[in-house]
Amino acid sequence: MTQQIQVDLGERSYPIYIGQSLMSDSETLSRYLLKKRILIVTNETVAPLYLKQIQDTMASFGEVSSVILPDGEQFKDLTHLDSIFTALLQRNYARDSVLVALGGGVIGDMTGFAAACYQRGVDFIQIPTTLLSQVDSSVGGKTAVNHPLGKNMIGAFYQPQIVIIDTECLQTLPAREFAAGMAEVIKYGIMWDAEFFQWLENNVQALKSLDTQALVYAISRCCEIKADVVSQDETEQGVRALLNLGHTFGHAIEAEMGYGNWLHGEAVAAGTVLAAQTAKSMGLIDESIVRRIVQLFHAFDLPITAPESMDFDSFIKHMRRDKKVLGGQIRLVLPTAIGRADVFSQVPESTLEQVICCA
């Protein structure tokens, strides 16, 4: 059964469809693609699995071309973004074109940013193929590429026309990538929904065995939460910042260790544990909450400690470049209970040093 969730942003509202076999559902896509020139952006891993299927689905609507990029966070940069622009220009794509992101978070972020920039904005569609992109990066309009000095530092807020989440894609997802996606799923429970967190604790095996009903529920609940948050705060001036739980520490891990060596979800898991330990040190939560968070990440085979090679100085140099920094102050999203979080801008560096050094 297909679930539909609406992201309510006035004239820029759009639906999210979640279910099975949706990549073959031409009816759902028809209103967004009819008489359009279509460029599918994908990568070398996804193309052999799903490119022909989606090309066949879209062929009746108009001209369909594709560009295939290398696979990996290390390729999410201006050089490979330019490959998308080159493909569009060489084929004389105009403003009535549609870009289709077929892949994980890297492809979605790059395609969305290309759509935002090309001829000052063309339509794009998200078809996320990884769990992480299905529950997080495909929804909400954040688009970006990385810079050697920081993650997602060059980008824009630009909403898709529609998000198509086909759960059958998860059958071909490597176990490590699935676990990385679960880090973002768990994040939603920690920062927003205590009942969902408890449901995750009770359904570890169902999710790890890719039970369809469990997957659809988990993905739908995450998308509901994100749609609610984004509808309240599209450009991250307030409540949307809570979605960055674990990300300030996590982005530091990714940047220091080299993009792609730690998957984004792996870094978020370790970063969320550090955030929970920081919250405990500040008296915001007790040890039992930290323990539940650690146990749930561990149940999905996610890292619960930072890399041994990273010391306080390694973290802090990257955290000072974080996009949430205001007035020179590092701002951290910290849990205040299971199901609640807040943004804190007065976290003593001595507390951070103690947490990082003891991790």
Curated annotation (Swiss-Prot):
Record's signal peptide: none
Keywords from the UniProt entry: Amino-acid biosynthesis, Aromatic amino acid biosynthesis, Cobalt, Cytoplasm, Lyase, Metal-binding, NAD, Nucleotide-binding, Zinc
Names of required cofactors: Co(2+); Zn(2+); NAD(+)
Annotated binding of NAD(+), by residue: 71-76, 105-109, 129-130, 142, 151, 169-172
Binding sites annotated in the UniProt record for Zn(2+): 184, 247, 264
Cofactor annotation comment: Binds 1 divalent metal cation per subunit. Can use either Co(2+) or Zn(2+).
Annotated CDD domains: DHQS (cd08195)
GO biological process, one term: aromatic amino acid family biosynthetic process
Gene Ontology terms for molecular function: 3-dehydroquinate synthase activity; metal ion binding; nucleotide binding
Main localisation: cytoplasm
Protein name: 3-dehydroquinate synthase
